[in-house]
């Protein structure tokens, strides 16, 4: 296993009057970001699909300072101008939400175009408000490395191959396309409107969470335990808290511009499996993975640009899994042991995950690209 850094974030304090807007505020990434912003003293406008649905927003309303510093707004990426009201008075925007539907019969019109239109609609709303100085967009590692000839190193100059994606149409292809086109369109449109545009590119996001449902990115990360084997031959990882701290850091940093990869660790599946077996022996985790070479080369997503402006990651890969496992246990989304079935000599069966407790595929779903690696969607 390899890591980029382990330290603390040197964060800046925002002006007391700073108001920011977070799209997708009720989701896995969005809700943690809202929590950290409130802790910093920001006033937060968070848009969600249905502010009246207490089951979906309860975790936000219970956050410290939510009663004084948090306002929830109803908005829809597919509806032009639906963000105009929520953005009033905001100095910054964190665009986390994205439409996702891997089973769409018409991905071009149901996923790709709405994502791009939604991005441009947000920039238009920013321009109308005339108060927004910076927009931070949660992109995806799927914009970096989906290509026929895989490399061992990727940085912010890397872009996935659209022609290859359209030709192969691998699982999640419409998500990759939507993120690539939205990011590129936003760069140009933000420049025209004199808005600082920053995109932050996470790999698989793992860690504790405050949502009530099982984040699909953790279905991927914990597949070693649950036996929902979307096997990550080798993967790149970031702790949810590090990712959200990086969002705020980049928003506050006066010299931040352009794309930033936010990836702290990379590891092959055998190393991750060994760690989980050692730290959580109560779970049955395979020692062999058919068809996966133990000497598989590591692919690195470089966070050098982010660290060069003094951001430092503070969480280890073990921290990520500890936070995820403990939270899932607390919320009764994961059993405390899977040893009984395995110890009886039977093939391990997948742990049933209730659809009641599973965030829909439209929210933060893990996506396998053509090499068996995974990235995450965000909402």
Swiss-Prot record:
The keyword NAD does not apply. It comes from the Eukaryota. One of its GO terms (biological process) is anthocyanin-containing compound biosynthetic process. Expressed in both leaf and hypocotyl tissues. It catalyses: a (2R,3S,4S)-leucoanthocyanidin + NADP(+) = a (2R,3R)-dihydroflavonol + NADPH + H(+); (2S)-flavan-4-ol + NADP(+) = (2S)-flavanone + NADPH + H(+). GO terms for molecular function: dihydrokaempferol 4-reductase activity; flavanone 4-reductase activity. Bifunctional enzyme involved in flavonoid metabolism. Belongs to the NAD(P)-dependent epimerase/dehydratase family. Dihydroflavonol-4-reductase subfamily. This is Dihydroflavonol 4-reductase.
